[in-house]
């Protein structure tokens, strides 16, 4: 199960961004080539394990977009993108986020108080992006039903749970050891479910 995902992760090059070990993968970076079978495998497993039920899927630019697109097609749930640029639309909410390798503003549009949402992203590592978005959604009185990432790396899921109460559900856990990506299964019903 998830053979394509695991293989792509194990074959990922690792680069340094400051002190941060960053793996380059189609799921998290869109490079090298992102095969449709990989995206389909990921979306099918998300649907099988987590059965998203919501009015909207919220994804985070940029690498949450392709996961939200395929998940939307599989479930019929529309999606909205938390963007990295301001549009100035009525009701737009600005969010400041910090990760292990970047910092900046995110902008939430198309989400209203009372909306039932599933938040999807490619990876949780430091938790900085998810923390910022989840705190903003809470302040907006949005009903967050689930928080799902394809990959869990580092301590981010624990940080998100401790600071927000939300459990980040992921398909696999990875770590970078000696410049290589190590992949660990998170079984259905496991610690993130």
From Swiss-Prot:
GO MF term set = guanine phosphoribosyltransferase activity; hypoxanthine phosphoribosyltransferase activity
* Catalysed conversion reaction: IMP + diphosphate = hypoxanthine + 5-phospho-alpha-D-ribose 1-diphosphate; GMP + diphosphate = guanine + 5-phospho-alpha-D-ribose 1-diphosphate
Please name the SUPFAM superfamilies in this protein's record: PRTase-like
Q: Which InterPro entries match?
A: HGPRTase-like, PRibTrfase_dom, PRTase-like, Pur/Pyrimidine_PRTase
Which GO BP annotation is one of this protein's? Answer: IMP salvage
Localization per record: Cytoplasm
Q: Which family does it belong to?
A: Belongs to the purine/pyrimidine phosphoribosyltransferase family. Archaeal HPRT subfamily.
Q: What NCBIfam families is this protein classified in?
A: HPT_Archaea, PRK02304.1-4
Subunit organization: Homodimer.
Q: Under which name does UniProt file this protein?
A: Hypoxanthine/guanine phosphoribosyltransferase
């Amino acid at each position: 199960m998830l053979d394509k995902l695991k293989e792509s992760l194990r074959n990922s090059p690792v680069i340094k961004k400051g002190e941060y070990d960053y793996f380059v993968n189609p799921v998290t970076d869109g490079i090298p080539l992102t095969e449709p079978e990989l995206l389909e495998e990921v979306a099918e497993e998300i649907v099988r394990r987590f059965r998203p039920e919501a009015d909207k899927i919220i994804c985070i630019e940029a690498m949450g977009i392709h996961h939200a697109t395929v998940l939307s097609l599989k479930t019929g749930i529309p999606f909205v993108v938390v963007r990295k640029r301001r549009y100035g639309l009525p009701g737009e909410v600005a969010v400041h986020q910090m990760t292990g390798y970047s910092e900046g503003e995110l902008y939430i549009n198309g989400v209203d108080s009372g909306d039932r949402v599933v938040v999807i992203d490619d990876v949780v590592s430091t938790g900085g992006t998810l923390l910022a978005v989840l705190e903003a959604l809470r302040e907006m009185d949005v009903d967050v039903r689930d928080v799902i990432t394809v990959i869990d790396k580092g301590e981010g899921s624990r940080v998100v749970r401790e600071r927000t109460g939300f459990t980040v559900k992921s398909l696999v856990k990875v770590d970078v050891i000696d410049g290589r990506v190590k992949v660990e299964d998170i079984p259905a019903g496991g610690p993130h479910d």
